[in-house]
Each structure stands twice: as structure tokens, then as C-alpha cells.
């Protein structure tokens, strides 16, 4: 029997007290630790800086994708990760760096305030703060508005031709020989770097950069209204996130190509990539995980996206920025002050963060899983043909699968449901008459609302998209809100496909070409 005054368990005691206090640095074994990254990983301030810098250099060194003298564009968002990335590049080019970075950096900031409903004054204040931070780096920088996507050319959706480079070691040796021949002692100053590599830094060039930035910072009001209408047409916050990511990628690619940058550094951390992995799988982008979360994204051909901060967790970045006074700018985004179930991206982030709080190895486990994913040889060796690439994200199309697939079954189900819906909603079908008779199109005088030009073009437009982008476009109320360069490129590809169908019987297959 249970007694009223019986004690069933001893008094709880704090067993963790004193375990993390008074620890010495795990590296130098001398100084007192000032931070604890993980259980048992205590660092002093100087050793933590050495550890942080070494990890950045090692990530770049073991991949060897940035050649000496190459122009690299740093994508700066104002957040902690991109701020730490810019700081690492800045320190890598200082006079005190033992092994200086040998590329030429530039910085790009994209103002996305319109998507969050920010006023013109708030956007100008944010851009002023960003400009003050970027001016302290001494690197050339560009500040553009997201509205500039409405003035992009259609060629931005075409995959560029990769530049054929020599062996990495040969490029380094040739660069060192050029340095010795020119009698240079270092690359500490960015202006010396630009002059050494033949980049024009004259006053006329600086004035042209100022005019370029002025044009991009103050877009026309019509572009602002179009951007507002585009995001208003998205039914869900998930679609808005995907649409923003797509437009931002297009604008970064355009600036990189226009200004001659062959590499773009992005500041995604290990934590951010773990969230992206889960959300992308949920959004039907699992086929492109090696491109979306890997170190190097080469889908654009002539411009590669690299992620040198992917080895760092957000905790490490926060410690580094706090200890060494790295400036950052807080700018509200689409996911600022929203509910945890408002979008798939937000739900994935909350899920990862809560698991990480209870199980500290969650992020590293998910991240290490993504490292094992590689692009298949078929996708990697695909040509630059327009129909083989997604119209929006430029990834290899993952919809060219057999009939015995889940994608094909989903398409049949969608087609049948849409056909039944059109049968009941189409006034022409309900009256037993065709909407177009005797060769006359119903788009003439008096045609009904059920016959919209865009509705006829929608199927061919969707066929040019990957599965993930199809889900995003499905949440748009109208395709007319998309930028003109997207619609023009879709029309151009449609004409090429129709032309190829007309002459297909006269073309030789690859097997026939080999026989001849």
C-alpha cells in the first residue's frame, strides 16, 4: 500500500554544475576557455580565431575551384553568415595573412524590402547601413534592388558555356611567375590587385559603377508595382519563398555575368543547409540536393555558386561575430515574425532548431548526409539544350521519366481531374457545341471568359519546368505576373520545340550518325 508520507525518489541534484566552469582551452592547454562550441570543445579567444580561420581556408583549399586572379562576387545579405564570410575574405587579403587569398573580390547586396512591404524610407535606411558596412571593407560593391529582375534579358535563362581552365597547380605556378616577373611583393591592397590583373580602376570606371548602382538602387515605380503584384499573386508563403529565391538567383547571375565575375560566394551555414535539405525534399526538389546544398553549384555553366561557410554552424558564427566585433545589419525578411506552420521552409527550420536544442548532433548528422549526395553522371553530362533544363531554376529536368513512375501517375490524375472540371465549367461543352468551329477562333468578338490566351499557353509553359518549380507556379494565380524575360524565353523555347517536331523526321539519330 502507498503511504502518505513515503518518499518515492531522492532529491534531484544538478550533476552538470562545475563541469564546464574553469576549463582550459582544449588546443593550447594553457589559457582559460571563453566559449564552448560542443560538449568537450572549449576554446580560448585566440585559439578559436585560429580554428575559425583555418576551417575557412581548408574549405577553399581542398576543393580548389577558385583559380588565382579570378574575380569572385560575395553575396552579402547583411546577416551573420555573410558578414563573417566577408570578414574572412578581408582578413585573407590583409598584410598579416600567412597565405593570402589570390582572387579579386567584389560584394553584391540585393534589397528585397518590397517583398516584405517595407516603405521607401525604411529601404533607404537599410541600404545606407549596408553601404557603411561595405565601405569599410575596401572592396568594390554593388547595391541593387530586386525590382531589377523586370529589366533582365532573356539570355539570363540560358546556360552559359563553362570556361576551359588548365590544371590548378599549373595556374598557381603561372600566377606566381607573373608576380615575380612584375616584382610584386604582395597582394595586400585590393586596388593593387585590380591594377595587377588588368582591371580598370580609373575614375571613369568608378563613375560608371556609381551610375550603375544609382540605376539599380532607384528602380522605376512601375517595376515596384509589378513586383508587388507578382508576390500578391502567390497563394502561399511557401511559394513566395521559392519565387524570391529564384528571382534573387537570376539577378545575382546577371550581375556576375555583366561585371565579369566567374564565381559567386554564398554564405549559407551548416545549419541553413540542413534546413534547406529537409525543405527541398518536401518541395519536390530532392533530385537537385547536390546542387542546392553542395559546395559548388555549376548549373549555370559560366558562373559557379560556391558555399565556403557550409562547414560552420550558426552557433560558431555567432560566437565569432560577437568576440571579434563583426558588423552585421538586421533586415526583415519574409519569414520575420511569422507562425511556425506558415510555410514549409519555416516549419523545417523550427523542426531542426528544436531537435538541435535537445540533440546537439542533429545539424551535423543531416549535413553529413547531404555531403554524400552527388549529381548523377547523366545529369552532369547533359548538354546545354534549352528543353533539357528547367526554365526557372536551370536545373536538369527531372520530369523525363518512364510511365511506371509516381510522377507519371500524378500527371495522369491531375489531367483527368482538370478534364472533368473543364467539361462542367466550359459553356461550349455544356451546350454540345465546340468553342471553335469552321476554322474560326473563339477569340473573336464576343468570345467568352472561358477562352483565355494564357490558359492555352499554360500547359506548354509547365512542361518546361522541373517538378519543384511546377509546384511553385501552381500556387500562382496568374502567369502574366511573371517577369517578361521569363515569358519571352518560354515562348522562344516553345517555337524551337515546335520547329524541331516539324523537321524531326528529317533528322538523324545519334546511332545513325555513328553508322555513317
Curated annotation (Swiss-Prot):
The principal localisation class reads cytoplasm
GO molecular function term, any single one = tRNA binding
UniProt entry keywords in alphabetical sequence: Cytoplasm, tRNA processing
Q: Where, per UniProt, does this protein localize?
A: Cytoplasm
Top-level lineage group? Eukaryota
An example GO CC term for this entry is: cytosol
**Is Nuclease tagged as a keyword?**
no
The protein's annotated pathway: tRNA modification; 5-methoxycarbonylmethyl-2-thiouridine-tRNA biosynthesis
Gene Ontology terms: biological process? protein urmylation; tRNA thio-modification; tRNA wobble uridine modification
Q: Which Pfam families match?
A: CTU2
Q: Which HAMAP family match?
A: CTU2
Q: Which family does it belong to?
A: Belongs to the CTU2/NCS2 family.
Role of this protein: Plays a central role in 2-thiolation of mcm(5)S(2)U at tRNA wobble positions of tRNA(Lys), tRNA(Glu) and tRNA(Gln). May act by forming a heterodimer with ctu1/atpbd3 that ligates sulfur from thiocarboxylated urm1 onto the uridine of tRNAs at wobble position.
List the protein's name. Cytoplasmic tRNA 2-thiolation protein 2
Supply the source organism for this entry.
Xenopus tropicalis (Western clawed frog)
